[in-house]
């Protein structure tokens, strides 16, 4: 057999060409000058059999540092967490895996209910009233929150803490430029937002203040103090939060946050180069009609049975593009499903235990670093990340660790000149005592 897969036969081609009124495929490219058309055969190797191809690809993949063979202490927004086995089984079912936006509720009840459950669990974690069906990732969720605030308050200035993830701030800058909004960064002090600087910057021109909880350095921000400053001028208070941390920390909603956003990656979504992720967006009832993205609501059908539908669709671009609250289109439904299944499998106590283990193992790692003579830069409370002064380029340290099958922490000098030679170390529930001890000992040996 010459070709294993036949996308179309010669008869199919002939019928398609006749339908559009041409005789040959070459006629489709008649607008391209002959002088620039490629002639001859491409220098492509001969086709391989499936076993040969699988062997070659496996050999190529074996060159990658994967988390089955390497202990990872790299976080900075993407974390190596446990995902219950059932997650992959459920999201691989064809009715979920291939489904698109469920515009027809009569044939999409399974997907709609799954999204509704995701929204419900996000509300429970964040302490907010309503959540959407997901965003692309935490960065776009943050930017969309700022756009909502600017539109609601009709103000042009956005204050964002420098302790917010640098990549999320970059996405915010991109959104703001197109809307002619001014983004002002509030410096951090001792690893958290400088409240004195924040107090001096908040005035009646500020649409919102954005902080991260825990922040990019792993530190837990003082949300109660920040909220008082923000709401003095009737600005909106936006908090970006790691949802897993909310299994242990007081939810932002309890501190008066107006919008809580973040990335659901810690729940069932693996680490992978470039994503995809799953942003979440939760807010109070006051902003329910301004929230971006899909919203699934619970209702009853003509027989009085419980059902689920897309609701408040007039906000969306497929209804009124020029009046839409956002131009975000397809949500991350499959990843939201993964997060839902992971949270459901863990249960409330499981999420709490997972968060507790992150805290306890990170605290153990901190103590071991200090015992080895390292300086842990910030003294405040943290969740599962903290900053270590390496006294030498972090890249050199990480290159050495990689030889020991360890993926080291994030090089803060990439984004903060004042934190050159500082490493952001992440310790999740998957890290063992032996792995933590090995990390500290290896770093101590090259200090």
Swiss-Prot record:
Q: InterPro entries from the entry?
A: GcvPA, GDC-P_N, GDC_P, PyrdxlP-dep_Trfase, PyrdxlP-dep_Trfase_major, PyrdxlP-dep_Trfase_small
Q: Taxonomically, which superkingdom?
A: Bacteria
Transmembrane stretches, by residue range?
none
Which keywords fit this entry according to its UniProt record? Oxidoreductase
Pfam families hit by this protein:
GDC-P
Q: Which HAMAP family match?
A: GcvPA
Q: What does this protein do?
A: The glycine cleavage system catalyzes the degradation of glycine. The P protein binds the alpha-amino group of glycine through its pyridoxal phosphate cofactor; CO(2) is released and the remaining methylamine moiety is then transferred to the lipoamide cofactor of the H protein.
Q: What is this protein called?
A: Probable glycine dehydrogenase (decarboxylating) subunit 1
Annotated source species: Bacillus cereus (strain ATCC 14579 / DSM 31 / CCUG 7414 / JCM 2152 / NBRC 15305 / NCIMB 9373 / NCTC 2599 / NRRL B-3711)
Q: Which gene encodes it?
A: gcvPA
